[in-house]
Structure formats: structure tokens, C-alpha cells
């Protein structure tokens, strides 16, 4: 019998089961209320900010107003200075800690507004049940969120590109992306490998076509990826935290092709769970455009017979081209049919399908011809002829050869984009209307990527060229000469980029010379070239209705490589890799005498400047080959009596008006000054015994030094007026409005051609500094380094001579005139110092000042002795003067100091000019 407790308050007691049900219902209500609060908090976090309190990190650090643009995802301040607009810093406010949902929303908001971490939004499109198009890009990610992978804190000094890796998955459709015309540089970000211990199941091997990595994932793999998110997040963050150390020491290139996959790369690509790929911001945007185009154009999703072909190429990397055969009993008929079907289904590379990308590339090509070609023709052919070479629609080209052609053209596009994007000047003022960042946000992001991954892009592009080389050599007889010309032009462009940037390593120059020698390019200059077949030459091919002499074009490329080798030897003091004597090759192969079809530049003024710069490279080649350091065992009397013959490089009338002629004259006078200063040390006692001899020697040295200072001042002034930063300034030259016009018979003219077209009939076709405003020259860095070294060494000579003349009194007639000339030289030295401060970016690549001097060989004054003097120490020791008067003791010290300057000038000539010197 149960006893009930009396109810003292007169309220009925409910059943305990009913109480339990009520408590459960209250819990559901509380849970729904809390969920609504969380949703409200997350909506509040993702809401666009309206106040200046949510400024980005850069604007907060500079204490300026942050004008954020929701369309571009970048504030106005960061866009003008070219910095990364990011919201990493979490504002510390008073009060209780924020909820977890708001913090996540802030991170998500910061990642969405990050221009380098740009991810286009995915939408759902109406799709037919029978067609399987590309799924959304958001489902291709194998991690929980992109914002959770942002590990390092990026500073303005060293910004690393935030790479978004994706799973390597099997492509199932969209032939439009296979025919993409986007640059191969979008694949450079794919050189990213996750940890092998992740054991991520891969749905197939990756397929890289035309430089675009296409991640497509099956619908059923999404759920499995969600289950693996927790186990993958930690190792992914650890891998992303390690930056690239040296891309030249990296392993194999990520570039793999269906047509020339090497055995090592093939075995690596066939292993499941080993490779991972990622997309750059530009490739993500390109894929989204391809999706939209494929959906609107209605491309059918057809499965082509690519499995048999890919297996065949995977097993045999050095494939043979298969010709079409009309015999139905031929065993390769079915494979040919499938290849032909796929080739017909692919969109054209430069056709109307990718009109935007084609226009963008021709814009880059136009920038090259306007700003680079006029000083050094890396592409030794005029713009109209080279544009015809890029057209993939050429007759008698089979499918396999067409695929190789497309890969080579993509490599060239990548190299040219790296050259242009890395040299474009970013304006820091809002007045600029042609800044690259204002032209297109996508181009701005691509430029930042190329700058931050400069060495990696160069290394990957050159590695892809090396991968193509065996196939190109084996099928040289069927591959068109125009494609081989583009292939070797790409090698020249890559070396040009490194030398222009001041790189001090020859890791790319040596293999490049080896590739040219492997194709026997040097035999083009030999008289018995017709006795054996040439790998580079086929029969002359028609370009339109005209015939191009590709032998002349390949000779030009080899001469350009020789000049690039000369510049490296001139700067670094290393031996030349090409020692072939070309004779007067510039006038023979680059002038308009070769014919109108293969002329380097049609504008007479631009062609004149090109020939001048190339002749300067030819003179520096002769200058380098006649170094005294290569004749260490020569007797000491021949060291000073032998005079280098520069008769064939005599300066013509009017050559001093241009920078190339001034620099050539400066090098000649430098050699004369070295010989005079070293002769002083040899006959020191004879000079001191006769005052007349001493006065004559001082007069000659003073005049020579003053003329050299005047030349240096003119060279630096011309460089400052032309382009002080040696970068592309889009405001200095207007670009044409249209870069790409299909089926247009009218030729597009560059600004240089349009300006100078009326001057063709005039007698004076000389190129002036005004015509070179804003152009980029590869000779500027060696010029500035050489001028800096010369001024650092000969700068004290005018002051020393003035003090000598004043102390000795009227030793000869015309002392006052000499002192006035030396005083004028001192004023020019002050102007030169100001010009060097303007040209400070050129000196950032300088070596350590004391690199070329032996540390142990120091004098009592702390000055380092010359390397060349140490080499010839036993051969050219100065004899001691006997019975020297006390008044001549100071003169002896001065002459000895001049001799030391001569030795250090010889160091500059013999050991390279890329470092500075102490007096």
C-alpha cells in the first residue's frame, strides 16, 4: 500500500511520466532557440561590414581609411600598392569571449576577401539527367574548409602564394577544358605533393592537358571525403607550412603529357594515392568559364577512345607518329579513328572559342614587342610573321604532332607571361590609369603568383622543355620547323629572364647550350653543313604565300644565346660556354639585307636600335675572349706591351649619341687606362728621375680619367631618362586598343611602328632616347655595375692630381687648365652619385664588396690587394728607386696608388663586374 504525501498548497500533483514528457519538450524548445541564435550569429558574422572598425590588416597598420570593394574583394589601399588585403588579425575587444560561430564566420569572411585565396562561388545549374557535366568545384575539395588551411602569417616583405590543393581525380567529361588556351603557368601551382601517409583513395590518375589541371570528382566520392576530413586536416596543414626552398633542386616536374610522358613520370602517375594537384586562382576562374561555356554551348559528353592511346604512350615514352592509312586491314586503323575523333572534337587553341584568352595572350605579346623587342630581340622575327607561326591550323599535321605543337606553344606562352608579368611596374598612385592591377583582377593575381613563385615557374617550364626534347629530336623530320623555332625561342626567353633579373647562377644556361649543341645548331655556321642532314631544318615551309628561311632564324637564335652567355661571363667572370667565332654575324644575319620576309623589325628606327645593341653584345664577346686572365703564363713584358686590337670595332660618327656607343667607348678607354697605370709601376724609378716624363704621364692619365667620368655621367643620365627601374611602365607607352582581330587583313602596328612609320623615308633613322622611353634592356644591369666599379676606383684620381699640381707649383704650362678640367670632373662625380642613388634597384644584386680580394693579403692601411696582382706578383714587381729625393717621396706614393688602381681595374675586367670594390 503506497502512502501519498499530502498536498499542502492545494495544487494537483502531476503524473511523473507526464513531467518527463514536458521536460523533453522544453529541451527541444531551448535547442531550437539556441540554434536560431547561432544562425543569427553566423549571419551577423558573414554580413558585409559597413564601418571602418573592420579595416584590413594593411590599412590598420598604416592607419588609413579602408575602402573595401565587395566586387573585387580587395580594398582600394591594398590594390594601389599591390599588397595582399587580408583580415588575419582578430580585433581584441573588451567583454566576454565571442561565440564560436562568430569566430568561424570572421575567418570565413577573411578568406572570401583574400584576392590570392580567391575561389569563385559555385552555383547549381539545370542539368539533363542524361548528361554528366562537371560538378561544382566546392565538392572537389578533400578538406573541411579552405579557411582552415591558412597557416602562415604573411608579411609584406615575403608573401607566399596560398595554394589550394585538390585530389587528383579522373576526368569524365568536358572536352572544352582539354582544349583550353590558358597558359601552362596555371599548372605551376600543381607542383604540390601531400604526405604519402595520408592513404587517400584516388579515383584515377590525373590528366594534365595544355597546362590546365582539371579536377573532376564522382558524386559518390563526396561522402567518403567528408568522412576523411578529420584525419586529413592535420597533415595537410603541416605540409602547407613548409615553403619552397629552391625550385631548381626540386624533383621531377609536375608537367606530364599524354604524348611524351617519361617512364619515371608515368610510373609515378600510375601509383594511386601518391599525387595531389592544386589550382591557382587563375585556373579556378578559367575552369568556371569553361563550365559556363560548356553548359551554354551544349557540348555532348562523349567517351572517346583515349584509354588505349594513353596506355600505349605510358608504356612507350618515345612514340612514333602514326600516319593515316586508307588500308582497312592496317592494325592501327581503329586507334587512328579514335584519335581523329578526339582531335576534331577539341576546340582550337587560338580560335573563337577561347576569344578572351587569345586576346589576353596577344596583349602580352604586344607588350613584349613594344617594351622588350626594341632593345634585344629574344624572338628574332617581326610580330606579324611570328603571329602566323602560332596559328595551330597548318596543313599536313597529324594528331600526335599537333598535340606536341600545342604543348610547345603553351610552354612559350608561359615563359613570355613570366617575362612580362614580372617586369610590369605597379603604380603606387591612384592617378595611374593603365596599371596592370586595374586592368583585370585576374591578371593582377597572376602577376603576384609569378613574382612570388619566380624560380619555380622558370624551373618547371624548362623541365617541361627538357621532357619534350627526346620526342622532338626523334620526330624532327615530321615536326614543322616553325614549332622547333618556337621551342628554341622559349629556351632563349627563359635565359633572358634570369639574366635580366640579375641571377648569378648558370644552372639554366649550361643545359640550354647543351640542347642547342645536341641539335647541332653550330653546324649551321660551318661551310660543310650540307654534307649531313640537319636536325633543325626541314624543307622551307610556307607561311601564307611567302617562304621563310629557317636556317637564318636558327642562326639568329644561336647568336642570341652566345650574347647571353657573354653577359653572364662579363658579369660573373666565368668562362664562356660558346667559343665559336661568328665573325660579323650581326650585320650578316640581323640586318634588313636578309630579306623582307624574315626581317627582325619592320620599323627602321627600332631596327637601328636593335642592331646597335646586338653589336654591343658582339663587342663585349670580343672583350671577354681577350681577357688577360686566360694568359697567366705569358711573360711579364708581353702583359703590358700587347695591346688588344679593337680596329674592327671602331666607333663610327654619331655613335656617341646612344648609350651602346658610349659604353663601348668606355670599355676601350678603360683598357687603355689599365695599361698606362700598370706601366707606371714598371718604370716608376725612370718617371721619378725625370720630371718631364712624370708630368706627361700625369697629363695623359688626367685627361683619360676626365673623359671616362664624362662618359659614365652620360650613360647613367641616359639610363635614368629612359627607364630608371628597367621595368614595363604601361603609362609611358599607350597600348593599342585591339590586340586580336580574327580574319583581319590589316596588320596591327605597335606604337613604335606607328610613330616611326612616317620617318622611314627620311635620311635620319637614328634611334634617340625619346624613342626608348619606358623600354626594358638586358644591358642596363651590366652597364650600371661596370660604371659603379669604374667610378669607385678612378674617383679619387682627380683630387689626387689637383693636390699634386698645387703642391709642386708651376711644373709646366697649362696647369690652370688642367686643374679646371679636373674640377669639372669632380662636379660630374657629384651628379653621378645622385644618379646612382636613383638607380639603387640595380645594386640589390651586388656581391659582397670584398669578395674578390684575399682576406690575408691586406696592407697596413686595411685595403685589400688585387687578385690579378697576386697572380702576377713574381712577374711584374716594381723595381726600387735609388737616390730618390725627399720631395719625390710623395710622388712615389701617388704613382704606387695609381698602379694599385690599375690592378683593381684589371680585376673588374677579368673577374666580372657584378660586385663593388674598395679603394
From Swiss-Prot:
- Where is this chain's protein located in or outside the cell? Nucleus
Top-level taxon of the source organism: Eukaryota
Q: Per the record, where are the segments of Polar residues compositional bias?
A: 23-36, 318-338
Keywords per UniProt: DNA-binding, Metal-binding, Nucleus, Transcription, Transcription regulation, Zinc
Q: Where is this region: Disordered?
A: 1-54, 297-338
From the UniProt annotation, give the residues forming the signal peptide. Answer: none
Q: How does it assemble?
A: Binds DNA in a sequence-specific manner.
Report what the protein is called.
Transcriptional regulatory protein EDS1
Report the source organism. Answer: Saccharomyces cerevisiae (strain ATCC 204508 / S288c)
Q: Which gene encodes it?
A: EDS1
Amino acid at each position: 500500500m503506497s502512502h501519498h504525501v499530502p498536498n499542502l498548497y492545494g495544487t494537483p500533483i502531476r503524473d511523473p511520466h507526464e513531467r518527463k514528457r514536458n521536460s523533453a519538450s522544453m529541451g527541444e524548445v531551448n535547442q531550437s532557440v539556441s540554434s536560431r541564435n547561432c544562425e543569427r550569429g553566423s549571419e551577423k558574422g558573414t554580413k558585409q561590414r559597413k564601418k571602418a572598425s573592420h579595416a584590413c590588416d594593411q590599412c590598420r597598420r598604416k592607419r588609413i581609411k579602408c575602402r573595401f570593394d565587395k566586387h573585387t574583394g580587395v580594398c582600394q589601399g591594398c590594390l594601389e600598392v599591390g599588397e595582399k588585403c587580408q583580415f588575419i588579425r582578430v580585433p581584441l575587444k573588451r567583454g566576454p569571449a565571442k561565440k564560436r560561430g562568430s569566430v568561424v564566420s570572421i575567418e570565413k569572411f577573411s578568406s572570401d576577401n583574400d584576392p590570392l585565396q580567391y575561389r569563385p562561388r559555385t552555383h547549381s545549374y539545370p542539368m539533363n539527367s542524361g548528361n554528366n557535366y562537371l560538378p561544382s568545384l566546392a565538392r572537389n575539395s578533400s578538406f573541411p574548409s579552405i579557411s582552415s588551411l591558412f597557416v602562415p602569417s604573411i608579411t609584406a616583405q615575403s608573401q607566399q602564394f596560398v595554394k589550394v590543393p585538390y585530389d587528383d581525380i579522373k576526368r569524365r567529361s568536358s572536352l572544352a577544358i582539354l582544349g583550353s588556351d590558358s597558359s601552362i603557368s596555371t599548372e605551376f601551382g600543381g607542383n604540390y605533393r601531400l604526405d604519402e601517409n595520408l592513404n587517400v583513395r584516388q579515383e584515377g590518375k590525373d590528366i594534365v592537358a595544355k597546362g590546365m589541371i582539371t579536377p573532376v570528382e564522382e558524386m559518390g566520392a563526396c561522402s567518403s571525403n567528408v568522412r576523411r576530413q578529420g584525419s586529413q586536416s592535420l597533415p595537410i596543414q603541416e605540409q602547407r607550412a613548409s615553403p619552397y626552398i629552391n625550385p631548381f633542386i626540386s624533383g621531377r616536374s609536375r608537367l606530364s603529357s599524354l604524348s611524351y610522358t617519361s617512364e619515371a613520370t608515368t610510373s609515378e602517375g600510375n601509383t594511386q594515392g601518391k599525387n595531389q594537384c592544386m589550382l591557382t586562382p587563375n585556373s579556378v576562374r578559367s575552369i568556371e568559364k569553361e563550365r559556363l561555356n560548356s553548359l551554354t554551348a551544349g557540348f555532348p559528353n562523349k567517351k572517346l577512345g583515349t584509354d588505349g592511346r594513353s596506355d600505349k604512350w605510358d608504356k612507350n615514352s618515345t612514340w612514333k607518329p602514326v600516319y593515316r592509312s586508307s588500308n582497312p586491314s592496317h592494325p592501327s586503323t581503329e586507334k587512328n579513328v579514335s584519335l581523329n575523333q578526339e582531335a576534331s572534337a577539341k576546340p582550337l587553341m587560338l580560335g573563337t572559342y577561347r576569344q578572351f584568352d587569345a586576346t589576353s595572350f596577344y596583349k602580352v605579346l604586344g607588350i613584349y614587342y613594344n617594351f622588350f623587342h626594341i632593345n634585344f630581340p629574344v624572338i628574332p622575327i617581326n610580330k606579324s610573321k611570328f603571329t602566323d607561326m602560332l596559328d595551330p591550323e597548318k596543313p599536313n599535321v597529324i594528331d600526335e604532332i599537333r598535340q606536341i605543337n600545342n604543348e610547345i606553344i603553351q610552354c612559350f606562352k608561359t615563359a613570355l607571361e613570366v617575362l612580362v608579368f614580372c617586369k610590369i611596374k605597379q603604380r603606387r598612385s591612384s592617378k595611374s590609369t593603365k596599371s596592370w592591377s586595374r586592368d583585370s583582377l585576374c591578371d593582377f593575381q597572376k602577376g603576384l603568383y609569378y613574382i612570388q613563385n619566380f624560380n619555380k615557374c622558370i624551373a618547371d617550364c624548362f623541365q617541361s622543355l627538357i621532357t619534350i626534347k627526346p620526342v622532338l629530336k626523334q620526330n624532327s623530320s615530321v615536326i614543322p620547323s616553325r614549332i622547333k623555332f618556337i621551342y628554341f625561342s622559349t629556351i632563349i626567353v627563359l635565359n633572358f629572364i634570369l639574366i635580366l633579373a640579375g641571377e648569378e647562377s648558370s644552372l639554366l644556361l649550361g643545359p640550354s647550350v647543351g640542347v642547342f649543341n645536341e641539335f647541332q645548331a653550330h653546324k649551321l655556321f660551318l661551310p660543310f653543313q650540307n654534307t649531313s642532314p640537319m636536325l633543325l631544318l626541314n624543307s622551307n615551309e610556307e607561311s601564307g604565300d611567302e617562304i621563310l628561311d629557317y636556317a637564318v632564324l636558327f642562326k639568329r637564335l644561336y647568336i642570341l644565346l652566345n650574347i647571353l652567355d657573354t653577359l653572364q661571363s662579363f658579369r660573373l667572370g666565368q668562362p664562356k660556354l660558346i667559343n665559336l667565332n661568328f665573325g660579323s654575324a650581326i650585320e650578316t644575319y640581323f640586318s634588313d639585307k636578309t630579306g623582307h620576309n624574315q626581317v627582325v623589325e619592320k620599323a627602321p628606327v627600332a631596327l637601328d636600335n636593335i642592331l646597335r645593341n646586338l653589336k654591343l653584345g658582339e663587342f663585349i664577346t670580343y672583350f671577354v675572349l681577350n681577357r688577360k686572365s686566360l694568359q697567366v703564363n705569358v711573360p711579364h713584358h708581353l702583359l703590358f706591351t700587347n695591346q688588344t686590337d679593337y680596329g674592327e670595332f671602331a666607333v663610327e660618327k654619331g655613335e656617341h649619341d646612344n648609350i651602346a656607343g658610349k659604353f663601348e667607348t668606355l670599355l676601350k678607354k678603360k683598357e687603355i687606362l689599365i695599361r698606362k697605370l700598370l706601366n707606371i709601376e714598371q718604370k716608376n724609378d725612370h718617371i721619378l728621375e725625370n720630371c718631364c716624363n712624370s708630368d706627361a704621364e700625369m697629363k695623359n692619365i688626367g685627361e683619360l680619367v676626365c673623359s671616362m667620368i664624362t662618359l659614365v655621367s652620360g650613360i647613367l643620365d641616359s639610363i635614368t631618362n629612359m627607364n630608371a627601374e628597367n621595368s614595363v611602365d604601361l603609362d609611358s607607352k599607350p597600348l593599342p586598343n585591339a590586340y586580336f582581330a580574327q580574319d583581319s587583313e590589316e596588320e596591327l602596328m605597335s606604337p613604335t611602328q606607328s610613330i616611326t612609320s612616317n620617318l622611314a623615308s627620311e635620311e635620319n633613322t637614328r634611334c634617340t632616347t625619346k624613342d626608348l622611353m619606358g623600354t626594358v634592356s638586358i644591358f642596363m644591369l651590366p652597364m650600371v655595375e661596370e660604371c659603379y666599379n669604374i667610378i669607385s676606383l678612378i674617383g679619387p684620381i682627380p683630387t689626387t692630381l689637383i693636390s699634386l699640381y698645387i703642391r709642386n707649383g708651376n711644373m709646366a704650362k697649362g696647369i690652370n687648365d688642367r686643374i679646371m678640367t679636373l674640377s669639372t670632373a669632380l662636379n660630374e662625380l657629384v651628379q653621378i652619385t645622385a644618379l646612382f642613388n636613383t638607380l639603387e634597384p640595380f645594386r640589390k644584386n651586388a656581391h659582397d664588396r670584398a669578395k674578390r680580394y684575399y682576406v690575408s693579403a691586406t696592407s697596413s692601411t686595411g685595403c685589400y690587394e688585387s687578385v690579378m696582382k697576386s697572380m702576377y706578383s713574381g712577374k711584374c714587381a716594381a723595381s726600387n728607386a735609388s737616390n730618390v729625393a725627399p720631395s719625390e717621396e710623395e710622388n712615389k706614393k701617388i704613382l704606387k696608388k695609381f698602379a694599385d688602381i690599375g690592378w683593381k681595374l684589371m680585376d673588374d675586367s677579368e673577374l666580372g663586374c657584378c660586385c663593388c670594390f674598395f679603394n
